[in-house]
């Protein structure tokens, strides 16, 4: 981290600041991760662990009066001292995967910091900025959208030079009302770019600014799968999922905007629960995509299931898709029809909204319903047979990773 003096933090009047250190060289919210010189920011129950943080070597502890404002001030202070080029990534789907791909592309040729997991909100973005070192050249941020103004607020802290909108689809409709609302909210990233910045956006995305370079993404970029890898833009990637090609194209556009060279071959380490593949008994396969779901990503996952399964029986364990507003029942029924269309032979629907999958999935040979993830575990364990190809996917709140973990344990 670019060091900050404790006295400077004190002058920001962010809350109750304690400690004997003169300089902080890191920021943590988990006392177990404290290293000497860190600032421990107590959030929620973290207030109980201040003494533990000091004992582990923290330079100071902060109990913020207004947590979001405190994190914003810390992130802004570090960002203002950094000469790194910042890339902000948002979109209805693919944000984290695009971030992971871009990080793998940049790392060989530039000192790069990128968001851990899905550190994409008012706490996660500043925490990522607080990892910038004096010699950091590129910072890759993921920007969440849970309503109007959030992306603009995050951009005010991060000041991205390059903005990537991966795609726009029906997500967070409870918060923004319509697809037009999603466009408006995502457009805050483009509006926040500096003159001379680069906006990388879907083909039909409206951009009114004339003082930024606009790169438009094709919905189906040219890609070729061979020998278990995918070739996009002259770069060989270690994945075969069809939807990742679009994420790779977006990442390559950002790489070009940064002026960095394209490597010939890249092995991406994707964040957990985003299409992780685990062998199952009898030549079966588990596709753990349980981190999140919406209609766009759910269809993409079903396409991947169909392409990957081959002659194996296709099993889908699908949970609720959250924040779809009044159209939620219709969206779930539409996905149910996609389940049937892509040849799924056994479907387990998890959650109240997931009943809609069953309504749309006429023709699927075997269907089951469970109230929650815990109740789904025994149903899935009974249903899955050796040699099956199993997709597990739902919105984050469903917690469907417990099903994936139960299946993976069988193969351990």
Regions found by a protein language model. Name each.
Residues 1-77, 308-309, 324, 338, ...:
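N-terminal leader/targeting and accessory segments in enzymes
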Residues 9, 38, 53, 74, ...:
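Residue-level signal for inorganic ion chemistry
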Residues 12, 16, 162-285, 311-312, ...:
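Acidic, Mg2+-coordinating active-site environments of NTP-dependent enzymes
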Residues 33-40, 130-139, 305-325:
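Mobile, glycine- and charge-enriched loop segments
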Residues 45-46, 271-273, 282, 290-363, ...:
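Active-site beta-alpha connecting loops in nucleotide-dependent enzymes
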Residues 62-65, 367-376:
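Short acidic-hydrophobic, aromatic-tinged amphipathic segments that line or gate anion-handling sites
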Residues 67-198, 207-211, 405-412:
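Phosphate-binding loop of NTP-binding sites
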Residues 377-383:
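Short amphipathic alpha-helix with an adjacent loop that forms part of the alpha/beta core around
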């Amino acid at each position: 981290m670019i060091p900050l003096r404790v006295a400077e933090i004190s002058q920001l009047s962010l809350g109750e600041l304690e400690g004997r250190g003169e300089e902080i060289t890191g920021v943590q919210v988990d006392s177990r991760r404290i290293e000497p010189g860190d600032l421990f920011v107590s959030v929620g129950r973290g207030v109980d662990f201040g003494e533990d943080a000091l004992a582990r070597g923290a330079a100071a502890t902060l109990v913020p009066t207004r947590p979001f404002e405190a994190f914003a001030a810390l992130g802004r202070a570090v960002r203002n001292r950094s000469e790194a080029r910042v890339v902000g990534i948002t979109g209805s789907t693919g944000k984290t995967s695009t971030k992971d791909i871009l990080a793998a592309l940049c790392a060989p040729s530039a000192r790069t910091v990128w968001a851990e997991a899905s550190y994409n909100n008012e706490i996660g973005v500043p925490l990522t900025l607080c990892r910038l070192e004096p010699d950091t050249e590129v910072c890759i941020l993921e920007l969440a959208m849970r309503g109007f103004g959030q992306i603009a607020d995050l951009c005010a802290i991060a000041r991205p030079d390059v903005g990537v909108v991966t795609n726009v689809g029906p997500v967070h409709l409870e918060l923004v009302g319509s697809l037009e609302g999603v466009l408006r909210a995502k457009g805050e990233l483009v509006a926040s770019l500096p003159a001379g910045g680069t906006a990388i956006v879907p083909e039909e995305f409206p951009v009114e600014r004339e003082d930024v370079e606009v790169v438009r993404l094709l919905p189906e970029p040219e890609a070729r799968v061979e020998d278990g890898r995918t070739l996009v833009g002259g770069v060989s990637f270690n994945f075969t999922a069809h939807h990742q090609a679009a994420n790779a194209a977006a990442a390559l556009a950002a790489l070009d905007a940064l002026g960095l060279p394209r490597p010939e071959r890249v092995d991406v380490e994707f964040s957990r629960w985003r299409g992780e593949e685990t062998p199952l008994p009898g030549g079966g396969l588990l596709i753990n995509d349980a981190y999140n779901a919406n209609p766009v990503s759910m269809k993409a996952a079903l396409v991947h299931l169909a392409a990957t399964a081959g002659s194996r029986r296709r099993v889908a364990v699908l949970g609720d898709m959250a924040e779809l507003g009044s159209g939620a029942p219709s969206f779930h029924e539409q996905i149910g029809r996609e389940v049937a269309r892509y040849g799924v032979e056994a479907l387990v629907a998890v959650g109240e909204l997931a009943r809609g999958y069953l309504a749309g999935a006429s023709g699927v040979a075997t269907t089951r319903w469970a109230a929650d993830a815990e109740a789904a575990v025994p149903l899935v364990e009974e249903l899955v047979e050796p040699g099956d190809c199993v997709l597990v996917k739902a919105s984050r709140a469903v917690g469907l990773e417990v099903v994936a973990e139960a299946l993976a344990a069988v193969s351990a």
